[in-house]
């Protein structure tokens, strides 16, 4: 259906259909993120010996996050007098829009994908970097020293870890011979890339956590140092945009990890009778659990340690991985 719409003559009907599909996808994403946050809180509670949300929506707290969303929507929307008003208003949208856009290129099964982009991996890397513009814009427009420092940290962290993140997937590109995410999954039909690219997987995983600004790399919004970081002056639904962008990227990165290193929807040997969507969901959930585990386990690192680790450890390891992968492919494939 999507291919037919793309190839058809442009018309207002097509625009309306695309708009309706976009709104529907946005509602699905928001619903998934809402209950994804609840799942994270329950897992964190379990790991810390707590019950977690259990008051709103029954024993499992199923409506707790919904109540939190309603609370955010009802909160007063304040704009500081000294803020750059147009940029302050626009920044949350700039931060959230790319997070929503990257989902279009991610294949969840061989039949479930919004748009099959020939260079889906390149598209994801390019578009995801735009969110930092929104973060820095919001930090600067707030006219607050803590917000500005958080925005500068976010920009420095993104630059420092985007490089090893991209370098870590070059081994995957060498083995699959494509930037198309569907082709990358197809290349893992026999052997998942986590088996032949363990170093690349570790570098990608660490760099992904840093890109997501999650513990132990949550320096741009370190409460003990910066109050709330780059969004310290935001409240209500504008603050919710930043939070949603963070969690949409969180789940999108887990899906990308599944596609690049865990074989996507391909099953384990002798278990092909289980549908591909189930396999993708299981692998995706495993990666999400791993990210949550990191948040619970590790303490926050210092800013200088963060920069030093990215440039002096991850980047050289990623370069060595590229060299070894190219050598092995040349000799044995």
Curated annotation (Swiss-Prot):
Protein location: Cell membrane
InterPro entries to which the protein is assigned, alphabetical: NADH_UbQ_OxRdtase_su1/FPO (IPR001694), NADH_UbQ_OxRdtase_su1_CS (IPR018086)
Membrane topology recorded in Swiss-Prot or TrEMBL: Multi-pass membrane protein
Top-level taxonomic group: Bacteria
EC numbers for this chain: 7.1.1.-
Keywords annotated in UniProt: Cell membrane, Membrane, NAD, Quinone, Translocase, Transmembrane, Transmembrane helix, Ubiquinone
Example GO molecular function: quinone binding
Main subcellular location of this protein, as a coarse class: membrane
Membrane-spanning intervals of the chain: 17-37, 88-108, 117-137, 159-179, 191-211, 241-261, 273-293, 313-333
GO biological process: aerobic respiration
UniProt catalytic activity: a quinone + NADH + 5 H(+)(in) = a quinol + NAD(+) + 4 H(+)(out)
One annotated Gene Ontology cellular component of this protein: plasma membrane
Family: Belongs to the complex I subunit 1 family.
Job of this protein: NDH-1 shuttles electrons from NADH, via FMN and iron-sulfur (Fe-S) centers, to quinones in the respiratory chain. The immediate electron acceptor for the enzyme in this species is believed to be ubiquinone. Couples the redox reaction to proton translocation (for every two electrons transferred, four hydrogen ions are translocated across the cytoplasmic membrane), and thus conserves the redox energy in a proton gradient. This subunit may bind ubiquinone.
Name of the protein described by the UniProt record: NADH-quinone oxidoreductase subunit H
Species of the source: Anoxybacillus flavithermus (strain DSM 21510 / WK1)
Gene: nuoH
